[in-house]
A protein has these predicted regions:
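Phosphate/oxyanion-binding loops and surfaces in catalytic or ligand/nucleic-acid-binding neighborhoods
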Residues: 61-64, 71-78, 166, 220, ...
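Hydrophobic, well-ordered secondary-structure elements that form the walls
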Residues: 593, 633, 645, 673, ...
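Alpha-helical adaptor scaffolds
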Residues: 359-367, 398-401, 432, 590-637
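An N-terminal, helix-rich hydrophobic module
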Residues: 1-115, 119-120, 224
Length: 690
């Protein structure tokens, strides 16, 4: 017999003598039991899905360790003792070499077996997780009255909301599935795009006080119908239908439903059918975020629902969130902030354990009060009850970047994208993170992903344009974007948004003028600004001011001093009017400072600019605060305070901000610094010296 054969025979004899076989079998049986128990218990304890995968990974890593310990030690009546080594006892170099070889071979065998087990087991867990995932597609409205489309949307939204409360399920957000309305795709294609194992589709017919609902649950892997259900009930039974559906879907997908989750699903949001109908229409307009007019219409419908049912906690919570958004994006006035606080508190008073009420309180603390830690605590409570709500992760990420926690912010925004993969608003927010960090490769990757979903997104195209200017001073992307966005959607042969909204039209006009100014095409900028009356620029908050201000800049560059002074004076009047409505709004204070600087009012401009930075310092807001610092630097540069301007710009270039070397080379506001040697040194310090 060869030496190797003798060695292997001895090795297997040692495994038997040291009871390694017995330990290996016992370990496999015990590990299998632990995995089975964890699969059943972890969802009931509301632990995240990754905890099960971590448990399996630790068990796999522990297998070779258990084998080595079994080789080295033995359990005797006297306790645990080191197993005597017969080979070493007989002496000889050869035996000692064989001993080391045995230990190495044992460890290697354990690792190989663990790796093989992991190869087969981990994909099974991932597949199991994919099976416990669902997209609820928009329901088809079969009612003769097309107004009932809101009702069909409400049914879909409520079913989705109920399912999203189940932690053991992955539920794709409403925003990411709405693109499939009237857009026939196979369940397999939808499942692949959204990363889900099942798709729910259905139709709703409402006639008088009766509602008929037909739903089908489809396996996204095979396109096979798992089950179908027809409901023909009184309108008052609509909540019972939604509850029944959520429980049946969870059962079909083998998702564990905790007692707390079941209680939340069984709870009716309101007993008043008319209040519910007003609520679903309000929710549809609210979530679309199409225009300020639509948001104000949604506000009135929420108020109608609350008037019909003053204890309608979900309506109170949604109205609070709406008021917070209006305060943040349109009207930063005290009355909006107080309304957001009040409605959130009423929702909590009415139903303290409603996750949406804590979400509303989180929004109010974030947008209204800038109390970030308190807001995150409320959102953590909301997340426990809404584990699949992308909105929660999105707002968490938005808050964290204002705290300067860029890594945590990016992780939460990535999580939101996982729950809402087709939501370009979430992708846009993630791209802003990378822009501030000057990671242009990642920013462009995210923007391109969004444009693949919505090829005519005004915000994404303009962000992509800004990225090219920020990084390289390249206007090619901007010119392409502006030309594309000016084309009618149908004529351009593109899917996505058709007619531009009033806000998008304003943004397009202002962006066209701004790009022309940066390129030194002052006559073109002026022609764009004068191509429409002031009303055409009112679709965006601050749009009229920006029009007048940029007109002043263009006239000054063209040597039209009288026209420049007139435009800046009108811009000043507009800035003062906007500031009177919201005196504590930092951007409005900044706008007044910028125009005062152009009018030669040096001291007033500096004081106003400093006030803006005090209202929104970087220590309070690491995301928007740098913009106020950059504005103060701009004012210093315009009024001839070069040293102060350069000091601020140096700091902004050294940390996350929207200021870049390429942009400073182009910005007309920096013209008075260009001949300053220190400015050139600053550009060389952070740039390539070109």
């Amino acid at each position: 017999m060869s030496t190797n054969a003798i060695f292997l025979t001895g090795f297997f004899d040692e495994l038997k003598r040291r009871k390694v076989y017995r330990v290996a079998v016992a370990y496999v049986i015990a590990a299998g039991g632990v995995i089975q128990l964890a699969s059943a218990v972890f969802p009931a304890w509301e632990l995240p899905n990754w905890t099960l995968r971590l448990t399996v990974l630790l068990l796999l890593v522990g297998f070779p360790i258990a084998l080595i310990l079994a080789w080295a030690y033995d359990v005797t009546p006297s306790g645990i003792r080191m197993t005597p080594n017969l080979a070493l006892a007989t002496g000889g170099v050869s035996n000692r070499v064989h001993h080391r070889r045995n230990v190495f071979l044992l460890g290697l065998s354990g690792l190989i077996l663990a790796a093989v087990a992991g190869f087969f087991l981990m994909p099974r867990l991932t597949a199991l997780n994919a099976e416990k995932s669902i997209a609820v597609l928009p329901f088809e409205n079969l009612s003769a009255d097309k107004q009932n489309a809101y009702f069909a949307d409400g049914i879909q939204d409520d079913i989705l909301t109920n399912l999203s409360k189940i932690r053991d399920l992955k539920v794709i957000s409403r925003t990411s599935v709405m693109g499939y309305r009237g857009n026939p795709s196979s369940a397999r294609a939808i499942g692949k795009t959204l990363g889900v194992g099942a798709v729910l589709e259905g139709s709703v017919r409402r006639e008088g006080n009766r509602v008929r609902l037909n739903v089908q649950l489809i396996d996204a892997e095979t396109d096979r119908h798992l089950w179908a259900e027809d409901y023909d009930r009184e309108l008052t039974d609509v909540f019972a239908i939604q509850t029944d559906l959520a429980q049946k879907i969870a059962q079909e997908l083998q998702a564990q439903l905790s007692a707390r989750e079941k209680e939340q699903i069984l709870r009716k949001p309101t007993e008043n059918g008319e209040a519910y109908f007003a609520f679903v229409q309000a929710s549809s307009w609210h979530t679309s975020l199409e225009s300020f007019d639509k948001l104000k219409a949604a506000e009135q419908l929420y108020l109608r629902a609350i008037q019909l049912d003053p204890k309608f906690s979900l309506a109170l919570a949604n109205l609070s969130i709406l008021e917070s958004w209006i305060f943040h994006a349109f009207e930063p006035v005290e009355v909006r902030r107080e309304l957001a606080r009040s409605y959130a508190q009423r929702a909590l008073d009415s139903q303290p354990d409603l996750p949406d009420a804590h979400l509303a309180r989180g929004y109010s603390l974030y947008y209204g009060d800038r109390e970030y830690d308190a807001a995150l605590r409320e959102l953590a409570i909301a997340e426990r009850g809404l584990p699949n709500d992308a909105q929660v992760s999105l707002v968490m990420g938005a808050i964290q970047r204002r705290q300067g926690q860029w890594q945590e912010s990016t992780a939460d925004l990535e999580k939101a994208i996982g729950l809402s993969p087709n939501d370009v608003w979430v992708l846009e927010n993630l791209a802003y993170n990378y822009q501030m960090l000057r990671d242009y490769q990642e920013a462009n990757r995210v923007v391109d992903r969004g444009l693949a979903i919505e090829p005519r997104s005004t915000n994404l195209w303009l962000l992509k344009s800004r990225l090219a200017i920020d990084e390289r001073g390249d206007f090619g992307v901007a010119e392409k974007a502006l030309n594309l966005l000016r084309q009618p959607a149908i004529g351009a042969g593109l899917k996505g948004k058709g007619e531009l909204s009033a806000e998008d039209r304003t943004i397009l006009l202002l962006s066209s003028a701004n790009v022309a100014l940066l390129q030194g095409k002052y006559e073109e900028a002026l022609a764009t600004l004068e191509s429409a009356e002031d009303d055409a620029f009112s679709g965006k908050p601050g749009g009229v001011f920006e029009k007048r201000f940029m007109a002043g800049l263009a006239h000054r560059k063209l040597g039209h001093e009288a026209e420049s002074q007139a435009a800046f004076s009108k811009a000043k009047e507009q800035a003062e009017a906007e500031l009177r409505a919201a005196p504590n709004d930092a951007p409005r204070n900044a706008n007044l400072a910028r125009v005062l600087a152009r009018l030669g009012k040096k001291d007033a401009a500096i004081a106003q600019a400093k006030h803006a930075t005090e209202l929104l310092p970087e220590s309070v807001d690491a995301f928007a605060g740098p913009e106020m610092t950059a504005m103060l630097a701009e004012v210093y540069a315009v009024v001839g305070e070069n040293a102060n301007a350069l000091g601020l710009l140096d700091g902004l270039l050294s940390r996350p901000s929207g200021v870049t070397v390429a942009l400073l080379r182009l910005d007309p506001a920096m013209d008075q610094l260009r001949d300053d040697r220190r400015f050139q040194e600053l550009l060389q310090k952070y740039g390539d010296g070109s």
